[in-house]
Amino acid sequence: MTELSANHGGSAKGTENPFEYDYETVRKGGLIFAGLAFVVGLLILLSKRFRCGGSKKHRQVNEDEL
């Protein structure tokens, strides 16, 4: 407790802070994830738009079913 109050909560010189992040790696990982999510989203949208199968079959609905 005296060590924390002596340096006001900061890390002492010579010791490595366990909460220090490598922001370059985090940034690259986030950009890769965002790019993959974008591509997967486009593939899903385009696969629903350009379906193979020709004409669409519409189901007839009776008034009783409404």
From Swiss-Prot:
Membrane topology label: Single-pass type III membrane protein
Family the UniProt entry places it in: Belongs to the FXYD family.
GO molecular function terms noted in the UniProt entry: ATPase activator activity; protein-macromolecule adaptor activity; sodium channel regulator activity
A GO CC term assigned to this protein in UniProt: sodium:potassium-exchanging ATPase complex
Sorted UniProt keywords: Ion transport, Membrane, Potassium, Potassium transport, Sodium, Sodium transport, Sodium/potassium transport, Transmembrane, Transmembrane helix, Transport
Protein name: Sodium/potassium-transporting ATPase subunit gamma
CDD domains per the UniProt record, alphabetical: FXYD2
Name of the gene this protein is made from: Fxyd2
GO biological process, one term: positive regulation of sodium ion export across plasma membrane
Pfam families found in the cross-reference section: ATP1G1_PLM_MAT8
InterPro entries associated with the record: ATNG, FXYD_motif, Ion-transport_regulator_FXYD
The protein's assembly and partners: Regulatory subunit of the sodium/potassium-transporting ATPase which is composed of a catalytic alpha subunit, an auxiliary non-catalytic beta subunit and an additional regulatory subunit.
